[in-house]
C-alpha cells in the first residue's frame, strides 16, 4: 500500500502480513431451531387476532447450513396461506426469509383455526414430527358497526378465573379437572358462539351456551396427562362471544407433569 502526503518523505509504502480466513458465523442465537441442516428463527406461527378482510404477515428467518444449495419450501400449505421466499435458493451459510400471508376471507369460521406446515429440508423431503411447524390464527367478530346505545346494553362476560393450575393434581393422578363459573353481567343475552381447545390433552364441557342477564353456568375443564406429550401447542381454552368488549376470552392452563 502506498501513502502520499505533504510530509517528508511524501511517499511511504506499507506492508501487511497475515492470513485471510473465512468469517465464522454462529446462528444459534438468531436462528435457534434446527431442522436437519436448516436453522430457523421460529418453530411455531401464531398470527395476531384478525377480523374478516385482514391479511396479516409473519416472517420466518432461514439459514442453510448444508453443503448444497437449498430451496426453502413449506409443504402442506392450507388454502388460506400464501408464501414468498427471498432469495429462492440459499447457498451454504446464506440467510433467507419465508414470508407467510394469511387471507382471512378464506378461513372457514370464527375462532381458532389450527394446522401444521412442514419445512422441506431437501428436495423430495417428506412430512414428519421433525420438520413440523404448527400454525394458529384466531378470527374475531367485528363490532365496529355498533352504536353507543347498543354497546351500553350489550352482554358482558365474567369468569371466576382465567388461570387454571392442575400441576399438583397431575403429579399424583392421570387426569385432573376444574370448574369455572361464567356469568353474564351485561344487559342482554350472552352467547358463547365457540369454545375451542388448543391442545388434544384438554377437554371441556359447557352446560349452557346462552346466558340471560345475571345468569351463570358451569364450564368444566379436564386435562389428561398421557395426552400432553411433546406437542408444541398451548394448553389453553378459547371462547368467542357476542360481548363487544371481550369477543375473545382465553383461559390459560398449567399442567406440569
What spans do the regions from the language model cover?
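Short, solvent-exposed loop/turn segments enriched in Ser/Thr/Gly
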Residues: 2, 11-13, 52-59, 105-118, ...
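Beta-strand-rich extracellular modules
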Residues: 2-8, 103, 120-124, 224, ...
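Long, low-complexity ectodomains and other extracytoplasmic segments of secretory-pathway proteins
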Residues: 6-57, 123-181, 185-186, 243-257
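Solenoidal tandem-repeat scaffolds enriched in leucines and small polar residues
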Residues: 32-34, 39-76, 82-84, 88-92
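Beta-strand-rich interaction surfaces with strong enrichment in secreted/lumenal proteins
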Residues: 48, 85-90, 105, 167, ...
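Surface-exposed binding patches on compact interaction domains or structured appendages
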Residues: 67-95, 187-216
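Short, hydrophobic beta-strand segments
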Residues: 98-106, 219-227
